[in-house]
Amino acid sequence: LTSSQTTNQIFVMLEAIARKQREKVLTLYYDLIELKESPFGILALLVRQCNQLLQVKDLDCLGKSNGMIAKQMKVPAFVAGKLKDQAKMFSMDTLRDMIEACAKTDESIKTGKISDRVGVELLLIQFSQK
C-alpha cells in the first residue's frame, strides 16, 4: 500500500467516524493492519488529518477561499476542497477532543499500558460510537 493510498483510507475512515459507522471504521482499520500498516502509523495519520481539518475549519471561519486555504496549507486546491467538505462534518470541539484522545492513546502505548493495535482499535470505537 502506498502512502497516498493509506492517507486516502484515513480520509475515508474519518468520514465513517463522522457518520458513526463503526463497522466500516473497524473494517478499514483491519484492512490497513492486514496490509502491514502499523497501528502507530495509523494513529499518526489520524492526528495529522484531524489537525488539517481543524486548520481548514479555522481558515474557513475566517472567510478564506479554497485557493487561499490550499496556498496556506500547501496542498492542491482539490485537496483543500475535500478537507473543507469533511471539516463540515465535525465541530471544532470534536476535532480537539479527538486529537487529545489520540495523544492519550499515544502515551498509553508508549508507556506499555496498552498494545498499539488494541489502543488504536479502542480509540476508533470511541470515535465512532453513536
Model regions and ranges:
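Helix-rich C-terminal "collar"/helical-bundle subdomain used as an assembly and partner-interaction module
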Residues: Q21-K130
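Long, charge-dense, solvent-exposed interaction surfaces that engage phosphate-rich ligands
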Residues: L1-V12, A16-R19, E34
